[in-house]
């Protein structure tokens, strides 16, 4: 499993109701234990959680939260989010774009020392784009971006096959 990694992406919520989702890091594939950055548009709040199971409602502890600027909770607008893990330190960066991001949450926790990454949609449409995961032992990709609209799953299989055979 990966450890000491950074994940960054653009995230867009299509509705401004509560519980749209966010991203999870250091996900334990067996137990569901994880860290999660979740968004709450009605209160313009972003929270960093530690959770013990796959269900976001079970066993969560709030490690930090940020309310307000720069999160204005607009619908159909991409925001930039980045989570950095280094040892037990966790940082959450957020902004209207990558070059305008600022550190909004910082926490120390060692409940999870490594794990997978996951997108986390709950009860509303969430769009993710420009995903980048970097860190020790994570292979770099030379990128083979493809517009997914109106593509069959076979297109992704061909890309993967071509990538493996290189």
Regions found by a protein language model. Name each.
Residues 134-149:
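C-terminal low-complexity, Ser/Thr- and acidic/Pro-rich disordered "stalk" regions positioned immediately N-terminal
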Residues 1-55:
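Secretory/extracellular carbohydrate-interaction modules
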Residues 2, 41, 72-76, 85, ...:
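Surface-exposed coil/turn segments at beta-strand junctions on protein surfaces, enriched
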Residues 102-132:
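Flexible glycan-contacting loops in extracellular carbohydrate-active proteins
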Residues 54-82:
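Short, aromatic/His-centered strand-loop micro-motif at the edge of beta-sheets
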Residues 33, 56-67, 98-106, 141:
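Surface-exposed loop/edge segments in extracytoplasmic proteins
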Residues 9, 73-106, 131:
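Carbohydrate-binding surfaces in secreted/extracellular proteins
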Residues 146-166:
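Short acidic, low-complexity intrinsically disordered linear motifs used
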């Amino acid at each position: 499993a990966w450890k000491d990694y950074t994940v960054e992406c653009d995230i867009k919520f299509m509705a401004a109701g509560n519980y749209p989702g966010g991203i999870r890091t250091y996900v334990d594939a067996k137990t569901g234990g994880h860290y999660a950055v979740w968004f709450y548009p009605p209160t313009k709040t972003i929270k960093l959680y530690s959770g013990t199971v796959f269900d976001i409602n079970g066993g969560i502890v709030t490690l930090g939260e940020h309310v307000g600027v720069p999160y204005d909770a607009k619908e159909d607008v991409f925001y930039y989010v980045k989570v950095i893990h280094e040892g037990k330190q966790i940082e959450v960066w957020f902004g209207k774009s990558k070059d305008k991001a600022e550190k909004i949450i910082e926490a120390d926790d060692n409940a999870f020392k490594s794990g997978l990454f996951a997108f986390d949609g709950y009860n509303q449409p969430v769009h993710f784009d420009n995903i980048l995961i970097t860190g020790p032992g994570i292979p770099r990709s030379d990128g083979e971006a493809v517009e997914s609209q109106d593509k069959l799953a076979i297109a992704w299989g061909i890309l993967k096959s071509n990538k493996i055979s290189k």
